[in-house]
Amino acid sequence: MAGLHSRLTTFLLLLLSALPAIAAAAPSSGCGKGPTLRNGQTVTTNINGKSRRYTVRLPDNYNQNNPYRLIFLWHPLGSSMQKIIQGEDPNRGGVLPYYGLPPLDTSKSAIYVVPDGLNAGWANQNGEDVSFFDNILQTVSDGLCIDTNLVFSTGFSYGGGMSFSLACSRANKVRAVAVISGAQLSGCAGGNDPVAYYAQHGTSDGVLNVAMGRQLRDRFVRNNGCQPANGEVQPGSGGRSTRVEYQGCQQGKDVVWVVHGGDHNPSQRDPGQNDPFAPRNTWEFFSRFN
């Protein structure tokens, strides 16, 4: 009987560990109130004496009583808020509008924020871009209904570096990040707390070498208590993406690494595929957390 009880307990623990990361919703102060921000609105604010801008995208039929997930989308160096909103030709290394995420959000579960960088980037001098994030999060939390446990961040290149910076400094605010071909470009204040972490990088990246992406990944493999992989996986035939799901991570602190044979490209496709895999992988990762 004791053996049966032990096996049953082990089975239940394994079953629970396989379930999606579900936490109680944490409705923001803007829930239950009329919205003070409208769909497509560009907001101007002041951070350390500098004028900053961001645009908000609300789902169709926004419901002030429904706590939405909030997703920050950071542009790469030389790009802009407007180029993330409108998109650029993915066949020439550009990004789909809003990084291709809204069409995958079939349940209309997310609000998107697209910030505009200083000098078209995220140098984050003296933490000013993290302060910008704090300002946006507070304004959106007060003016719209979000689940403050479901705040996410993604970006390509410099935008990936900014998402990594938030994973370091705002682990208590950000549920998960997706770093697309990123590097440590925007600093890493703190950097010792666990955050769910997705990253992808190309082995032929001539702008930010794949080793830079691996370095960022390894920080959160350690922080999240995951078992290190045995060696580095390589892209598949024809440069096809290869995916590693790290094992042994803390509950809800998953780490996923995708490596491909391409260059510095946010819209990399696998051979024979029409659509880039970053949007699908990012949305799948963020959707794990409810």
Swiss-Prot record:
Keywords (A to Z) from UniProt: Carbohydrate metabolism, Hydrolase, Polysaccharide degradation, Secreted, Serine esterase, Signal, Xylan degradation
Top-tier EC class: hydrolase
PANTHER family assigned: FERULOYL ESTERASE D (PTHR38050:SF3), PTHR38050
GO terms for MF: feruloyl esterase activity
EC number(s) from the headed UniProt entry: 3.1.1.73
Protein name as catalogued: Feruloyl esterase D
Primary role: Involved in degradation of plant cell walls. Hydrolyzes the feruloyl-arabinose ester bond in arabinoxylans as well as the feruloyl-galactose and feruloyl-arabinose ester bonds in pectin. Active against methyl esters of ferulate (MFA), sinapate (MSA), caffeate (MCA) and p-coumarate (MpCA).
GO CC annotations, alphabetized: extracellular region
Entry superkingdom: Eukaryota
Region (Disordered): 260-280
Similarity comment text for this entry: Belongs to the serine esterase family.
Localization annotation: Secreted
Catalytic activity reported: feruloyl-polysaccharide + H2O = ferulate + polysaccharide
Keyword Isomerase: no
Primary localisation category: secreted
GO terms of biological process kind: xylan catabolic process
Signal peptide: 1-25
